[in-house]
Curated annotation (Swiss-Prot):
Name of the protein: Putative serine/threonine-protein phosphatase C06A1.3
Keyword Amino-acid biosynthesis: no
Species for this entry: Caenorhabditis elegans
E.C. number: 3.1.3.16
GO cellular component, one term: nucleus
Binding site for Mn(2+) 1: D93, H95, D121
An MF annotation (GO) of this entry: protein serine/threonine phosphatase activity
Record family assignment: Belongs to the PPP phosphatase family. PP-1 subfamily.
Regions of compositional bias (Basic and acidic residues) in chain numbering: 11-24
Matching InterPro entries: Calcineurin-like_PHP_ApaH, Metallo-depent_PP-like, PP1_catalytic_subunit, Ser/Thr-sp_prot-phosphatase
Recorded catalytic activity of this chain's protein: O-phospho-L-seryl-[protein] + H2O = L-seryl-[protein] + phosphate; O-phospho-L-threonyl-[protein] + H2O = L-threonyl-[protein] + phosphate
Active site positions: H154 (proton donor)
Keyword Hydrolase listed: yes
């Protein structure tokens, strides 16, 4: 059932079963599925700029479960290391800021006209995580070769049960849907490789990342443990405190310095690493020259920061540019601050060496 933004009734049409997915180019091979996805995308787009309704007004729980089943089947057909060709745009954390994600699309373009790779953290902290996921899932089903969805650390049950997504699912559709999403998250790819030369992930590097096959060979479905390659891909952070590996101030995974980035680029035969995971004031921050980029893609994060949003753009020749969305004014009285620099190449004379908080790690 198609609806516009003023219709407060839930849709009633039952979605196609996951078995209707064709193995290749499913939208062209299955006109019925393509028509339904177009309708779902239209309904999801009706929520943009209309804050009086949410996804419950335009999508039934049964439809959402059908969409989840279809997209997780597509994820399982993809490699853990999704390979895509440039030109492409790389998008960082969204954190349930559905309205801001759509404003970003207004700036950078939408699928299928643009090819996009998301680096995870679709849920938590903001109010519309289900909306973010279902729009992106519908786009993935409809245009699977134009959009790539990687897993973030918030796409794990131990995190999103605490930071908002569990309560959102409970309020909108019931706890059962939260479990369906966890099953889907366990099937999402962990990393992306653009034109064989640009490695993308949510968190960062790992002492266990020996070659790209170590990513490809991570079994799925999988739920992260407390350590290991998958945890590092989701959780690790760069630091300008030194060259090597350090224990993370997060209490999980590691921090890695300039020397680790340079060695990884050499051993993995890549030119650039793009990751997300940390809010940065300009929406992007570079380390080790342009060998590592952190990107964050929604503004005014949690209304606690005054950060801009940004997207990393790679043209066909892998030349880098950025599209930036300036943050809109926050409501009067909001106590927000600038996001701190995280690992920007420092002035060596001004760099602080926090030896107590950042402790070196030596791989055994």
């Amino acid at each position: 059932m198609s609806t516009d933004g003023n219709n407060n009734k839930k849709g009633s049409k039952e979605g196609p079963k996951s078995s209707e997915i064709s193995k290749f180019d499913l939208a062209k091979e299955n006109p019925k599925l393509a028509e339904w996805m177009d309708d779902c995308i239209k309904r999801m787009n009706s929520l943009y700029k209309d804050t009086n309704i949410n996804i419950c007004n335009v999508m039934t729980g049964h439809e959402i479960i059908s969409i989840i089943r279809m997209v997780e089947a597509i994820f399982m057909e993809e490699s853990n290391l999704c390979e895509a060709e440039a030109p492409i745009k790389v998008i960082g954390d969204i954190h349930a800021q559905y309205q801001d994600m759509n404003r970003l699309f207004d700036l950078i373009g939408r699928v299928p006209e643009e090819k996009l790779m998301f680096l995870g953290d679709y849920v938590d902290r903001g109010p519309q995580g289900i909306e973010v996921l279902i729009l992106l899932f519908c786009l993935k089903i409809r245009y699977r070769d134009r959009i790539y969805l990687l897993r973030g650390n918030h796409e794990t049950p131990s995190v999103n049960k605490i930071y908002g997504f569990y309560v959102e699912c409970q309020y909108k559709y019931g706890i059962g849907l939260w479990w369906d999403f966890q099953s889907c998250f366990n099937r999402m790819p962990m990393s992306g490789l653009i034109s064989k030369r640009v490695l993308c992930m949510h968190g960062g590097l790992s002492p266990e990342l020996i070659n790209l096959d170590t990513i490809r060979n991570i079994p799925r479905p999988c739920e992260p443990l407390d350590r290991g390659l998958l945890i590092d891909l989701l959780w690790s952070d760069p630091t300008n405190k030194g060259e090597g590996w350090f224990h993370s101030i997060r209490g999980i995974s590691y921090m890695f310095g300039k020397g680790v980035v340079e060695q990884a680029c050499k051993s993995l035969e890549i030119d650039l690493i793009i990751r997300a995971h940390q809010v940065v004031q300009d929406g992007y921050e570079m380390m080790t020259g342009r060998r590592l980029i952190t990107v964050f893609s929604v503004p005014n994060y949690c209304a606690q920061f005054t950060n801009a949003a940004a997207v990393v753009c790679l043209n066909a020749n892998l030349q880098i540019s950025f599209q930036q969305m300036i943050p809109p004014p926050l409501p009067e009285g909001t106590k927000a601050k600038a996001a701190p620099a995280i690992a920007i190449d420092p002035n060596i004379d001004a760099a602080r060496a926090d030896k107590d908080a950042i402790k070196p790690f030596v791989k055994e």
